[in-house]
Amino acid sequence: MTEEHVVLLDEQDKPSGTLEKYAAHTLNTPLHLAFSCWLFNEDGQLLVTRRSLSKKAWPGVWTNSVCGHPQQDETTEEAIIRRCRFELGVEITDLTPVYPHFSYRATDPNGIVENEVCPVFAARATSVLQVNSEEVMDYQWSEFKSVWKSLLATPWAFSPWMVMQASDEQARERLLNYCQR
């Protein structure tokens, strides 16, 4: 895969440049564009992934299915499809926004900051997973309600963005409705 960049955003969330992805994530990460996607299988189960230990931010924590950064001149939807293929080796369908205006800032235990405008989507996995071990060290298909209970009981075991996204009542309801259709 070619070197990835993040699209930097100004105070009005408008693109203001790019920066190499690894260089962007520091103790003082600038605001940038990202995405988060929750994948469901045909049985309505949610794919929860555990981030590789080689990840710069939040290594080894459990998180939603796939996250990433749209590249310059790439739509968020195109970026989600690209990252699903790269991280999970999976094709998707029925890509649906569930929390289009999500943004957050969080600092991991090593001091690395995430500072993102991060629209959240749900999608349906349509092929068998072929996980990239450089991105994902473990994964599990689980019932959404079971994952929600785990998020409430042990939020420290999950990425902060996953906890924040699921804690939004409207987003949680949209995810629940998505997995039941």
UniProtKB/Swiss-Prot annotation:
It holds the Pfam family NUDIX. Pathway: Isoprenoid biosynthesis; dimethylallyl diphosphate biosynthesis; dimethylallyl diphosphate from isopentenyl diphosphate: step 1/1. GO terms for biological process: dimethylallyl diphosphate biosynthetic process; isoprenoid biosynthetic process. Its cofactor is Mg(2+); Mn(2+). Gene3D superfamilies: Nucleoside Triphosphate Pyrophosphohydrolase. The active site is at 67, 116. Homodimer. NCBIfam families: IPP_isom_1 (TIGR02150), PRK03759.1 (NF002995). This is Isopentenyl-diphosphate Delta-isomerase. It comes from Salmonella newport (strain SL254). The lineage of its organism: Bacteria, Pseudomonadati, Pseudomonadota, Gammaproteobacteria, Enterobacterales.
